[in-house]
From Swiss-Prot:
GO terms for biological process: DNA-templated transcription elongation; regulation of DNA-templated transcription elongation. GO terms for molecular function: DNA binding; RNA polymerase binding. The keyword DNA-binding applies. Keywords: Coiled coil, DNA-binding, Transcription, Transcription regulation. It comes from Thermotoga petrophila (strain ATCC BAA-488 / DSM 13995 / JCM 10881 / RKU-1). This is Transcription elongation factor GreA. Gene3D superfamilies: Transcription elongation factor, GreA/GreB, C-terminal domain, Transcription elongation factor, GreA/GreB, N-terminal domain.
Length: 156
């Protein structure tokens, strides 16, 4: 499998999720399965079926995270510069509306719009990578082409 690029923050978040899932997998779900078995006939036991399904889902996620972490390449904060790279925060201005937005450019695995984390694989993320303060980018959106100017780039 090829390397998966993650910020330090994204790597630590996945490690914590893995620990939490393993704890849940080992104790909570196992206990639910045990309790459901004690109810008798497993062929019509919805609690047992639900617990087994949850066990499968959690087990799959554990394997997925372990795969990601074992192939992770951590992106450390780089030197201060005005170039947009992975892990950097960027302030952009929509030249059509005047609205400003602040995002951190992250890998697709870490993207979270509500936490201001923009995927480097998104149309806007792709167009911003490698740009510098003052550069203008054009992005195709459902509402038409949007123009953004890079106003600031920072590590934090």
């Amino acid at each position: 499998m090829k390397k998966v690029r993650l910020t330090r923050e994204g790597y630590e978040k996945l490690k914590k999720e893995l620990e939490d899932l393993k704890r849940k997998f080992m104790y909570e779900i196992s206990e639910r399965i045990k309790e459901a078995r004690e109810l008798g006939d497993l062929s019509e036991n919805s609690e047992y079926e639900a617990a087994k399904n949850e066990q499968g889902r959690v087990g799959s996620r554990i394997m997925e995270i372990e795969q990601i972490l074992s192939n992770a390449e951590i992106i450390e904060d780089s030197e201060e510069s005005d170039e947009v790279t992975l892990g950097k925060w960027v302030v952009i201005k929509n030249l059509d509306t005047g609205e400003e937005h602040k995002f951190r450019i992250v890998t697709p695995q870490e993207a979270d719009f509500f936490a201001q984390k923009l995927s480097s694989d998104s149309p806007l993320g792709k167009s911003l990578l490698g740009r510098k303060v003052g550069d203008v980018v054009k992005v195709k959106a459902p509402s038409g082409v949007q123009r953004y100017q890079v106003m600031a780039v920072m590590n934090k």
